[in-house]
Amino acid sequence: NIPSLGWVRIKEKGYIPTTKDGYVIKSGSVSIKADRFYVSVLVEIPDNKITDDPNEGIGIDLGLKEFAIVSNGKTYKNINRSARLKKLEKQLIRKQRSLSRKYENLKKGESTQRANLQKQKRKVQKLHHKIDNIRADYINKTIAEIVKTKPSYITIEDLNVKGMMKNRHLSKAVASQKFYEFRTKLQAKCREKGIELRVVDRWYPS
């Protein structure tokens, strides 16, 4: 129920945990991205006790060549090297260049119409959003598959992402891997499933 608008139907079902026991929706907000409206909610989830699971724990190494290598032998590829994302990245570069030319023409007083400029800007935004969604979906599926094995604990390295971003040769590749998003979502999923998450420094013996 949105103030001044009333009840609004959401396109996707099941994303907001309205029927899960112990889950409490605390607040919400509506935003617009690439001409689409999105709702974000803050949800309080119950503290599930860490289970005394007889299964072994696993370790996860995140990287640039491969996205994640799990100690159980499973490897998750770097999706940014897939043909699909490479094609979309090339499209994005072309559309960004076209947008830059339209801005330059506008500054020079040439006949670029503002409507055409906004149209091209929306194309760039939509492509950015599409690429982000593909990466986020891959992270969600990777985490779901890892957690599904029901390890007693999961160990990951406390990556210095800020330090890695300072390397101009690696910054773009690091940003596209979304390591922080992976860690944040993994923490939430482990908490939900009662799995202990161990975040260790790079010198931790494993």
Regions found by a protein language model. Give the residues of each.
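Acidic carboxylate diad motif detector
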Residues: 1-33
